[in-house]
Amino acid sequence: MTLSTSQSLLEKTALETYVPPARPSLIGLSRAELAEALGGIGVAASQRKMRAQQLWHWMYFRGVQEFAEMTSISKEMRSQLAEHFTVARPEVVAEQISNDGTRKWLLRLPSGVSGEKAHEVECVYIPETDRGTLCVSSQVGCTLNCSFCHTGTQKLVRNLTAGEIVGQVMVARDRLNDWADRETPNGNRLVTNVVMMGMGEPLYNFDAVRDALLIVSDNEGIGISRRRVTLSTSGVVPNIVRAGEEIGVMLAISLHAVRDELRDELVPLNRKYPLAELLQACRDYPGASNARRITFEYVMLKDVNDSLDDAKLLVKLLSGIPAKINLIPFNPWPGTAYKCSDWDQIEKFSEYIFNAGYSSPVRTPRGRDILAACGQLKSETEKLTAREREALRAMAMTD
């Protein structure tokens, strides 16, 4: 296969020191928080609810980037807002476009500590014929150390704020020119689905993820239905049922093994929350039904977890859970010891699960050539060496 990658690097250095703005961004605030912020700059209590709703419309429905564009708000109020706040998103440092159309953005965030280097996360847009899926990060780095995952090789730096999570969705709409306007207020959008499957464990950043997803799914703003928003977890059991109660989005479980001994190795969180506890939490997940199935993600690792015995035990373990199983061909990254299962074996594994009554699609790898596929994300703070880039190129060309 010929590697054809279009890469546009903006004229910025990813590791230069970032100075946080003096004016906070309103992105990520709920209506109540917007009203409170308005009160802090002297807006009369009788006007706060109405003004907050105006801000909500312009920020989350229209996606404007300057208060001056909010034409339904008086010039005096716009000037007052601009004096104290911004509607800034995370800064795009680099954009890569895969030969399959997948886009990956490297986004700069404030460090939160004066004098520290900027932090970065990655966000991926995957276009398909019937949808456009945005893969969003919840943390800078990750604490889980899953052995097959590239992100797990980068230590956890910090949680993202609700604004930084919502900001990823807004950046995608900015870059894709995907906001509503007067001509197409209800037109088809390019970003139709959001998956919390980027860097980090969402349920270890519960409050910010909850607040962000409630904004993303609000039908008077960004307006992505909760049925089109999926939260993926490696199994933070105490927060699974809570997520169903407080967020109400679709649930995905990064399963990857059907025996505790192996899952302890692949997903070390299993040592704290073993399979029996995880699967019980899935059975208790509010709203789970045949119409709202839980997705179980299963990376196919050659001679590790891909035998028919594994498939049989998987079916047994999921008994009584409205489920579908996404089989993920392992996406290589420089330095990994794992290999992807042979395609024939993946098909046999999938066929057994399907014949047992479960949907078992094999996920098409997207964005491998730009390290944008499942399990490959890692912020550019830890840059690949030239040798690692050549290794990645060779991996992509042999698929």
Swiss-Prot record:
Q: Which UniProt keywords apply?
A: 4Fe-4S, Cytoplasm, Disulfide bond, Iron, Iron-sulfur, Metal-binding, Methyltransferase, rRNA processing, S-adenosyl-L-methionine, Transferase, tRNA processing
For binding S-adenosyl-L-methionine, which residues are annotated in this chain's numbering? 200-201, 232, 254-256, 331
Which metal ions or organic cofactors does this protein require, according to UniProt? [4Fe-4S] cluster
Provide the disulphide bond pattern: 135-374
Q: Which domain of life is it from?
A: Bacteria
* Entries under Pfam families matching the protein: Radical_SAM (PF04055), RlmN_N (PF21016)
Name of the top EC class for this enzyme: transferase
Indicate where this protein resides in the cell: Cytoplasm
Concerning InterPro entries, the annotation shows: Aldolase_TIM, Methyltransferase_A, RlmN_N, RNA_MTrfase_RlmN, rRNA_lsu_MTrfase_RlmN/Cfr, rSAM
Identify the stretch annotated as signal peptide in this record. none
- Which note does the record give on the cofactor? Binds 1 [4Fe-4S] cluster. The cluster is coordinated with 3 cysteines and an exchangeable S-adenosyl-L-methionine.
Per the record, its GO cellular-component terms are: cytoplasm
Q: The Radical SAM core domain covers which part of the protein?
A: 128-371
Gene Ontology biological process terms in this record: rRNA base methylation; tRNA methylation
Which coarse location class describes where this protein primarily resides?
A: cytoplasm
Q: What is its EC number?
A: 2.1.1.192
For this protein, what reaction is catalysed?
A: adenosine(2503) in 23S rRNA + 2 reduced [2Fe-2S]-[ferredoxin] + 2 S-adenosyl-L-methionine = 2-methyladenosine(2503) in 23S rRNA + 5'-deoxyadenosine + L-methionine + 2 oxidized [2Fe-2S]-[ferredoxin] + S-adenosyl-L-homocysteine; adenosine(37) in tRNA + 2 reduced [2Fe-2S]-[ferredoxin] + 2 S-adenosyl-L-methionine = 2-methyladenosine(37) in tRNA + 5'-deoxyadenosine + L-methionine + 2 oxidized [2Fe-2S]-[ferredoxin] + S-adenosyl-L-homocysteine
Residues noted as binding [4Fe-4S] cluster in the record, renumbered to the chain: 142, 146, 149
User: What does UniProt list as catalytic?
Assistant: 122 (proton acceptor), 374 (s-methylcysteine intermediate)
In terms of HAMAP family, this protein maps to: RNA_methyltr_RlmN
The UniProt record's further free-text remark is:
Reaction proceeds by a ping-pong mechanism involving intermediate methylation of a conserved cysteine residue.
Tell me which family the UniProt entry assigns to this protein: Belongs to the radical SAM superfamily. RlmN family.
Query: What is this protein's record name?
Result: Dual-specificity RNA methyltransferase RlmN
Q: Which organism is it from?
A: Rhodopseudomonas palustris (strain BisB18)
